[in-house]
Structures are given as C-alpha cells and as structure tokens.
From Swiss-Prot:
Homodimer. The lineage of its organism: Bacteria, Pseudomonadati, Pseudomonadota, Gammaproteobacteria, Cellvibrionales. It comes from Saccharophagus degradans (strain 2-40 / ATCC 43961 / DSM 17024). PANTHER family: NADPH-DEPENDENT 7-CYANO-7-DEAZAGUANINE REDUCTASE (PTHR34354:SF1). This is NADPH-dependent 7-cyano-7-deazaguanine reductase. SUPFAM superfamilies: Tetrahydrobiopterin biosynthesis enzymes-like. It is found in: Cytoplasm.
Length: 268
C-alpha cells in the first residue's frame, strides 16, 4: 500500500491522463473477512459523486457537471481516491466534442482500472437532487452501552421476534489507512429478521471510531458482522460518506436485491 499516491505530493495533470487511476485489489480486504470473489454473500455498488468536474468544449468554453460513478461490488479493484481526483482534474484543460464523449471515455477508463462494470452519469448542476433524511429511525439518541473504539461484532444484540425495519446513525467515523485522516459518514441498515437492539447497533457503529480502512471495506465488514452476529433474513447496508477533494464515496451492499437508495444527506 506504500506505493499508492494517497498522502504523497504530486503535480496535477494539465491534460487528460487515464494513467492517473490507481486500483487497489478488493481481495486485500476481503480475504480478512473470509470472502471469496466467486461466492460473495451480497451484491452492491460503490457510488461516487464528483462535485468538481469540468472540461472544455471544442470552442474552449468550460463545461461543469455533477458526476455519478457506480462501481459494481464485483469489480476486481476499488480506485484509490486521490488518484481518482487527479484523473478527474486531468479533464479540466482538455477539449471534448460532447458530454456524451466525456461520459463514454470515463466509463471505459474506470472499467479498465477497476476490472469490472462501471456506470457513469453526468448531469448539469440544475438537475442535482435536494438534500434528504434517510428513511427509518435515527438511533443516535440511544444511550451508549459501551465506549469501545475498535470494531467488535460482539456488541451487536438481537431480541426474539421478527421485524422489518430501517435504522441509521450519523455517528460513523473511520480513518484512512494511509493518511490517518478521519472519514465521516451516515450509515443506514435495512433488514428483516430478529430485532437488532438500537443501543447495540449504535455501540457497534461507534466502535469504528479508531478503525483504519477504506470506505468500501468498512461497509463490507459491517455487512458481514451483522450477518454473522444477527442472522437477518434480508440485509442492506449503505454508508454516505462526506466528500473530500470534491468526491464522496457511498458503498451499498445487499443480499436481497434491494434498490439503491437515491438520497443525498445534509453533510454532502
């Protein structure tokens, strides 16, 4: 991991440069969770939003857009965030024939870098959705049962009796494994099964406070821990992280084919 560009000083490219993109194999994290790429217990997406996206049209006139980048959870690799930022900035002084040409090129480059399916959507600023509150119950006012700051699945508790509900917390904090910078997020859990006590889920969320890992890996650990400890019939986990360098990362994992929630929260 020491070879990646995150945390290093580098010059921003002045022209289109797909070589900026730096993949990190998903297997590096998944092996520690006992996950096999050929038999994943979930499907999902990593949804990145790019807020600082610009290029030139053929006349040299700047274009600006909001970019939505959806990486299938089955891709071989995630893309290191700083390299993604450098890649997007390489479009700033490059001329393109159309928005469609930019979108197609980005989709090809990101698919090549990640080794799998990627969907890219560019939208004008006027099309951006308003802020929303996640569906379900916020658990942040529950008392904290244990002040533990490293992930501990044993904190999760269930009560007998099947329910179908959605719980969320704004208190998720993890940390970049390269720079140590804090990563802040709202995490949303939708499930059907024995009732997860809100207090125990809150304690579990808080236990990530000193944990170092990438966003995507944190969500997969949350998913696998809840499955192992609580055994829900259906489970979806979604984290909306705050943006850094004009990009936010929003991993979603589900075992029931649930639709990706479309909301954007207040810290984004």
């Amino acid at each position: 991991m020491s070879s990646i560009e995150l945390g290093k000083q580098a010059e921003y490219p002045e022209q289109y440069s797909p070589d900026c993109l730096e993949p990190i194999a998903r297997s590096l994290s998944r092996s520690g969770l006992g996950l096999n790429a050929s038999a994943l217990p979930f499907t999902g997406l990593d949804v990145w939003t790019g807020y600082e996206l610009s290029w030139l049209d053929l006349s040299g006139k700047p274009q600006v857009a909001i970019g939505y980048f959806e990486f299938d959870a089955k891709t071989d690799a995630i893309v290191e965030s700083k390299s993604f930022k450098y890649y997007l900035n390489s479009f700033n002084q490059t001329r393109f024939e159309s928005w469609a040409a930019v979108q197609t090129l980005m989709q090809q480059d990101l698919a090549n870098a990640s080794g799998g399916d990627v969907n890219v959507r560019l939208e004008p600023l006027s099309a951006v959705s308003p802020l929303e509150t996640p569906a379900g119950q916020c658990i942040d006012d529950c008392p904290l049962e244990a002040a533990v700051y490293t992930p501990d699945a044993a904190l999760l508790k269930v009560e007998q009796g099947e329910v179908s509900e959605q719980l969320f917390s704004h208190l998720l904090k993890s940390n970049c494994p390269v720079t140590g910078q804090p990563d802040w997020a709202t995490v949303w859990v939708s499930y059907r099964g024995n009732k997860i006590t809100p207090e125990s889920l809150l304690a579990y969320v808080v236990s990530y406070r000193q944990h170092q890992d990438f966003h995507e890996n944190c969500v997969e650990k949350i998913f696998t821990d809840i499955m192992a400890q609580c055994a829900p019939v259906e489970l979806s986990v979604y984290a909306r992280y705050t943006r850094r360098g004009g990009l936010d990362i929003n991993p979603f994992r589900t075992n029931c084919g649930a639709a990706l929630p479309g909301w954007r929260i207040v810290r984004q």
